[in-house]
């Protein structure tokens, strides 16, 4: 799965969870050893993306890591507001 596919996967997962889908941003920072994906959503949607006790965020992170396992680089995923 390519880097762009990882970004598309995140957007596809997060879009139904938020009230402001136009404010979804996935920022990719890539080095020789890792791909860092940072998700930004509207301030009022942050809690929805994180979920109770972080369960939703953990599920998103698990899906992203599973999709990125074919990459030779380590995949890092963060949510920020």
Curated annotation (Swiss-Prot):
Keywords: Cell shape, Cell wall biogenesis/degradation, Chaperone, Cytoplasm, RNA-binding
Signal peptide: none
Any GO molecular function: RNA binding
Pfam families xref list: KH_KhpA-B
GO CC annotation terms, alphabetical: cytoplasm
InterPro entries, per database record: KH_dom-like_a/b (IPR015946), KH_sf_prok-type (IPR009019), KhpA (IPR020627)
Record domain KH: where: 34-81
Any GO BP: cell wall organization
Subunit note: Forms a complex with KhpB.
Its biological purpose: A probable RNA chaperone. Forms a complex with KhpB which binds to cellular RNA and controls its expression. Plays a role in peptidoglycan (PG) homeostasis and cell length regulation.
Family the UniProt entry places it in: Belongs to the KhpA RNA-binding protein family.
The protein's name: RNA-binding protein KhpA
Source organism of the structure: Bacillus subtilis (strain 168)
Taxonomic lineage of the native organism: Bacteria, Bacillati, Bacillota, Bacilli, Bacillales
């Amino acid at each position: 799965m390519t880097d762009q596919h990882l970004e598309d996967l995140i957007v596809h997962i997060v879009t139904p969870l938020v009230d402001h889908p136009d404010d979804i941003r996935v920022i990719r920072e890539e080095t020789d050893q890792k791909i860092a994906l940072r998700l930004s959503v509207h301030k009022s949607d942050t809690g929805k993306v994180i979920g109770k006790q972080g369960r939703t965020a953990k599920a998103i992170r698990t899906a992203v890591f599973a999709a990125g396992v074919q990459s030779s680089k380590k995949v890092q995923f963060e949510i920020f507001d």
